[in-house]
Amino acid sequence: MFPADVILQCFGFSVGIALVGYVISLFLDWSEEEGDEDDA
């Protein structure tokens, strides 16, 4: 069996990737909405 530390690291890494992608998607959506007036 894998040590608990390895499982936690893999789980934390996956969650970190998911959170980063989620935050980036939110930021892109926000920047697009806020950037329309600036570009115009």
Swiss-Prot record:
UniProt keyword Signal, yes or no: yes
Domain of life (superkingdom): Archaea
Signal peptide: 1-27
Organism: Archaeoglobus fulgidus (strain ATCC 49558 / DSM 4304 / JCM 9628 / NBRC 100126 / VC-16)
Record-given protein name: Uncharacterized protein AF_1204
UniProt entry keywords in alphabetical sequence: Signal
